[in-house]
């Protein structure tokens, strides 16, 4: 059976093809949940479900190809997360929970290798040390697998700014890993 592209899957899903929508979900949801784990921790699955509900509700209005679809879904997820943070800021809450981070393979991105060489708990700790804008950009690039232009559209920054944030964030992660490696070799 020939594999159909996500672009054609988007058009078929918009026409009501449930199997096409399932294909889109299977292809994109794991990356979406990984990104949301960085932003929302234990609430990532719930936030992903809310995102997909919004996607279903707005699918008929989406215009674009498969790459645009992924960016659109991540934008919806980010907006859902920010809306939740705004609501939470209006009421007292307690932070906590055991946050897990599942990492995607870095592919050809050498900077992302730093993120992938470490375990879940260490990755979360190190990404948590980054400035919030660096952490989000690093998460979208390495965990979401998105291109610079897509990340720029999602976070509302210029592509050059996204490149700088990504580079600085990944450099800080690599430096932290190197410091850890030196410390471990001295012990």
Can you say where each PLM-predicted feature lies in the sequence?
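Core residues of bacterial helix-turn-helix
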Residues: 25, 48, 55, 141-144, ...
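Amphipathic, Lys/Arg- and hydrophobic-enriched alpha-helical face
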Residues: 24-42, 58, 127, 179
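Amphipathic alpha-helical segment used for protein-protein interaction
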Residues: 15-18, 106-140, 144-154, 175
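Short, charged helix-capping/linker segments at alpha-helix termini
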Residues: 14-22, 33-50
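Structural recognition of an alpha-helix C-terminal capping motif at a helix-to-coil junction
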Residues: 46-53, 67-79
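Internal acidic/polar
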Residues: 2-6, 91-120
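DNA-recognition helix of helix-turn-helix
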Residues: 78, 82, 134, 143, ...
């Amino acid at each position: 059976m020939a594999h159909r592209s996500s672009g054609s899957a988007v058009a078929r899903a918009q026409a009501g093809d449930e199997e096409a929508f399932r294909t889109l979900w299977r292809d994109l949801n794991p990356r979406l949940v990984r990104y949301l784990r960085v932003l929302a921790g234990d609430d990532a699955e719930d936030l992903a479900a809310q995102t997909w509900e919004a996607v279903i509700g707005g699918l008929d209005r989406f215009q674009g190809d498969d790459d645009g679809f992924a960016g659109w879904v991540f934008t919806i997820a980010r907006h859902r997360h920010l809306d939740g943070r705004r609501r939470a800021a209006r009421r007292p809450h307690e932070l906590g929970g055991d946050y897990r981070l599942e990492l995607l393979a870095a592919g050809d991105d050498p900077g992302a290798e730093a993120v992938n060489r470490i375990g879940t708990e260490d990755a979360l700790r190190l990404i948590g040390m980054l400035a919030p804008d660096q952490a989000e950009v690093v998460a979208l690039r390495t965990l979401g697998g998105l291109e610079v232009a897509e990340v720029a559209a999602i976070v509302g920054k210029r592509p050059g700014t996204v490149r700088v944030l990504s580079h600085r964030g990944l450099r800080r992660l690599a430096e932290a890993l190197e410091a850890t490696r030196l410390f471990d070799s001295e012990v």
